[in-house]
């Protein structure tokens, strides 16, 4: 009798859980296929426009807005001079560069002083957003390019990247600012392309684009001149992941006006709107709107997501008819970590930051005034990004345990049809999503007169590179996904325990990739 009761209970549990886990994987991959379908046409249009638009018209236009490039720097003594040198030679008619030394403990400030002949000065500092104490301000005395109005260096007490960005915003004299990482590489056309979007649609308060992986590319004079595959397998898996996330994920969400993240590596913002929304979130920000939305002395380890979600909320609460946009082709290149410990730190921080952003703005869920953000984008992130790791792991454990019970104890809980459907939904369909994402990113679209020219989003030089990447797209669900699942779960556990902090990881530096871009 006891055995029969155990069998009955186990069978009942199986009947309840089977459709739950199968439904989750079907829903997730269906969601991704929807974004791929939405993004494919957008990518084709943008690829064609990317190569036929005459962006030089921006140079002579009275409507071209000046920009401020805000560069937070913490212990960047090795790369900061090269990074700033590349920035001041960017192709844009009018801009200034503000480097914020966030209390570096190395020689970052001194190498900047020597390279750009910095002179201490008392420049206007608008204390619009609360920050850590600014110790000194410097301006460059070297001869700058004609289109660069000034190069400013702020030396402040250490308080994190978000606080450094706020200090840069306070110093900015332009209506728009660019947030970027000190170790990123900008595409030569990036600034003009993003500001062209702002000119065409004045409703845009923030715009970003795809961040591509620089590992394996050939870099010359601070520019990516040839796209290749990284030599390390972890970086190749990340390339598949970035294509799925940026090329299809965010491009598809952009079609729905529902982009929730613009990468902190590179994005353009309307300054006054960001100031009115309270700036980047730190415990030092004392702003009525920030306190209303997230509480007093709140902070986050993923400022790039939180500021975008808060801007969506602020725009729909106060401004209406404004939007946040995304470009599918690469506007910046960044080095991704190749060591597992560095990847663990990065993914754990991302998961903690995701939780913070979602919980801070949970009042937006299913509220009519927030439109697709409240009814589609945020619920999707809650289900697939926040609860997803838990549901995924539980689903795998469920199948494994019940298969063991059936094999060892002869308790028929799982039927063969369900097991096949589960594997197809979780692994087979997931692999198909990866393959589609790579094809959208690497496919050569025709453009120009009579469609004679061909170009892809990521212009790989060899077809072999694309085939190798497709192989990694197939393998991703079997090797890479289980590791990221573990890191995401660990990140959630750290968040529940109240862990904070960036856990900054060491980078190899672009020197490894200069003139050595290996294709395989």
State where each predicted segment sits:
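N-terminal membrane-anchoring/stem segments of glycan-assembly enzymes
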Residues: 1-63, 250, 431-438, 484-500, ...
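Membrane-interface helix-boundary signature
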Residues: 4-21, 370-377, 381, 416-419, ...
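Long, highly hydrophobic alpha-helical transmembrane signal-anchor segments
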Residues: 4-5, 9, 13, 297-299, ...
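Hydrophobic helical membrane-anchoring modules
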Residues: 9-16, 48, 447-464, 468-472, ...
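Residue-level signal for the membrane-embedded core of alpha-helical transmembrane segments
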Residues: 21-24, 28, 71, 241-244, ...
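Membrane-embedded multi-pass helical conduit in multi-pass membrane proteins
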Residues: 39, 380-496
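Membrane-proximal soluble regions of multi-pass membrane proteins
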Residues: 342, 346-359, 468-517
């Amino acid at each position: 009798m006891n055995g029969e009761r155990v069998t009955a209970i186990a069978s009942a549990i199986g009947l309840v859980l089977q459709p739950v886990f199968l439904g989750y994987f079907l829903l997730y991959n269906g969601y991704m296929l929807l974004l791929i379908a939405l993004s494919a046409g957008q990518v084709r249009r943008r690829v064609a426009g990317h190569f036929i638009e005459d962006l030089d018209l921006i140079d002579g236009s009275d409507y071209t807005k000046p920009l401020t490039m805000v560069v937070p720097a913490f212990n960047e003594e090795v790369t900061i001079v090269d990074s700033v040198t590349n920035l001041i030679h960017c192709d844009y008619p009018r801009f200034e560069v503000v480097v914020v030394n966030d209390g570096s403990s190395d020689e970052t400030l001194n190498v900047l002083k020597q390279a750009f002949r910095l002179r201490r000065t008392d420049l206007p500092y608008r204390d619009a957003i609360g920050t850590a104490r600014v110790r000194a301000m410097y301006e460059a005395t070297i001869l700058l390019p004609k289109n660069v109005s000034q190069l400013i260096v702020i030396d402040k007490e250490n308080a994190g990247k978000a606080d450094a960005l706020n200090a840069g915003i306070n110093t900015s004299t332009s209506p728009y600012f660019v947030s970027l990482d000190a170790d990123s590489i900008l595409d030569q056309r990036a600034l003009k392309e993003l500001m062209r979007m702002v000119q065409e649609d004045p409703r845009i308060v923030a715009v970003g684009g795809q961040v591509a992986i620089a590992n394996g590319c050939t870099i010359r004079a601070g520019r990516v001149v040839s796209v290749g595959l990284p030599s390390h397998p972890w970086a190749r898996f990340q390339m598949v992941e970035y294509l799925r996330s940026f090329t299809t994920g965010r491009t598809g969400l952009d079609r729905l006006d529902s982009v929730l993240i613009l990468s902190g590596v590179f994005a353009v913002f309307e300054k006054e709107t960001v100031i009115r929304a309270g700036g980047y979130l730190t415990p030092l920000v004392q702003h009525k709107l920030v306190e209303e939305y997230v509480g007093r002395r709140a902070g986050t380890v993923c400022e790039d997501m939180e500021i975008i979600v808060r801007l969506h909320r602020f725009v729909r609460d106060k401004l209406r008819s404004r939007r946040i946009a995304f470009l599918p082709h690469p506007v910046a290149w960044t080095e991704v970590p190749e060591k597992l410990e560095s990847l663990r730190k990065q993914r754990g921080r991302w998961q903690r930051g995701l939780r913070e952003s979602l919980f801070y703005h949970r009042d937006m869920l299913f509220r009519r005034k927030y439109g697709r953000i409240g009814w589609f984008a945020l619920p999707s992130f809650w289900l697939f990004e926040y609860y997803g790791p838990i549901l995924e792991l539980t689903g795998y454990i469920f199948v494994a345990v019940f298969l063991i019970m059936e094999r060892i104890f002869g308790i028929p809980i799982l039927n063969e049809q369900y097991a096949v459907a589960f594997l197809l939904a979780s692994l087979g369909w997931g692999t198909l999503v990866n393959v589609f994402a790579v094809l959208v990113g690497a496919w050569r679209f025709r453009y120009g007169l009579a469609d004679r020219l061909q170009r892809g989003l990521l212009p790989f030089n060899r077809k072999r590179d694309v085939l190798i990447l497709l192989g990694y797209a197939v393998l991703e669900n079997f090797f890479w996904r289980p590791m990221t699942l573990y890191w995401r779960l660990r990140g959630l556990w750290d968040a529940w325990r109240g862990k904070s902090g960036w856990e900054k990881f060491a980078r190899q530096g672009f020197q490894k990739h200069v003139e050595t871009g290996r294709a395989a």
